[in-house]
């Protein structure tokens, strides 16, 4: 399996790939299982295992990639495709670059879509101390859970009511939700889900009025320290591959926090019949 390092391409054993995917997949499952029933019914939120993969769909929001995709060890692409056909949304599968699964979906006529780059780092390594413009980083208070949900929903382009999906994660077991505060107001957030000896950094969101103040750099550093305190062996995070060869702000923040790119995960999309 090809791995894109800072200066070279090496081969990653499948076992290592699965090790680095495990915290994200566990967090993904837990987050979807936490969706309130009323919201799940309203938007057609469904998650299941099919064909060896973790499959999620939002029938009411078919155009949102973040809510309609399959991840994990895809062993039976046909079974994965049947899941999406049943939900009435296009199939989007995230597969390791250069893998047998990627070749299988390409053979089914799928088209390559956007890709996510996976990054990893050892939480025991030195952690940068990013500067923030007057922001304080601390755990999200229970009273700010609703605000956290609002920020996450807005950041991912989701309907406002789906903030009620993410808000309970602030106090849910396994989740460590941190916030950047301007005085007493929560203006940015980021979470760490701990599982399988690793941590998945996710749900990064910043109020647009407070961008450029170093919030996400500080939140990444704080989550690395949480992972260290928990005794985790690695922290992983992902972001979209550069468009036009120009890394975005998220990519640059991740590198500054000491993460290294470890593998690319392309998404492949089914084509209309």
Model regions and ranges:
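Conserved acetyl-CoA-binding loop-helix of GNAT-fold acetyltransferases
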Residues: 76-81, 203-206, 212-229, 252, ...
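A conserved beta-strand-loop-helix scaffold within acyl/acetyltransferase catalytic domains
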Residues: 159-208
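Helix-loop element at the rim of GNAT/NAT acetyltransferase active sites that forms part
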Residues: 87-88, 151-161
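Acyl-donor-binding surface of acyltransferase catalytic domains
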Residues: 8, 72-136, 141, 234-237, ...
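A short helix-loop-beta-strand connector motif used in the catalytic cores of GNAT acetyltransferases and
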Residues: 40-49, 88-90, 113-115, 169-179, ...
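Conserved beta-hairpin
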Residues: 46-52, 97, 103-108, 174-188
């Amino acid at each position: 399996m090809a791995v894109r390092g800072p200066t070279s391409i090496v081969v990653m054993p499948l076992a290592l790939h699965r090790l680095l995917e495990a915290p994200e997949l566990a967090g993904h499952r837990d987050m979807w299982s936490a969706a309130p029933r009323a919201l799940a019914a309203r938007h057609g939120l469904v998650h299941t295992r099919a064909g060896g993969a973790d499959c999620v769909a939002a029938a009411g929001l078919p155009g949102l990639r973040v809510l309609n995709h399959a991840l994990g060890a895809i062993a039976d692409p046909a079974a994965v495709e049947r899941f999406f056909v049943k939900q009435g949304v296009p199939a989007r599968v995230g597969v390791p670059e250069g893998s047998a699964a990627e070749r299988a979906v390409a053979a089914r006529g799928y088209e390559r879509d956007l890709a996510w780059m996976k990054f990893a780092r050892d939480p025991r390594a030195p952690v940068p101390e990013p500067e923030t413009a007057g922001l304080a980083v601390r755990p999200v208070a229970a009273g700010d859970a609703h605000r956290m949900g609002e920020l996450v929903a807005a950041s991912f382009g989701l309907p406002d009511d789906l903030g009620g999906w993410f808000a309970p994660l602030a106090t849910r077991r396994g989740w460590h939700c941190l916030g950047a505060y301007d005085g007493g107001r929560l203006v940015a957030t980021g979470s760490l889900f701990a599982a399988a000896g690793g941590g998945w950094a996710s749900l990064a969101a910043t109020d647009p009025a407070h961008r450029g103040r170093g919030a996400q750099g500080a939140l990444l550093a704080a989550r690395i320290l949480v992972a260290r305190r928990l005794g985790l062996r690695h922290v992983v995070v992902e972001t979209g591959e550069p468009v036009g060869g120009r890394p975005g702000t998220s990519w640059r923040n991740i590198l500054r926090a000491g993460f290294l790119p470890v593998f690319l995960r392309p998404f492949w999309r089914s084509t209309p019949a």
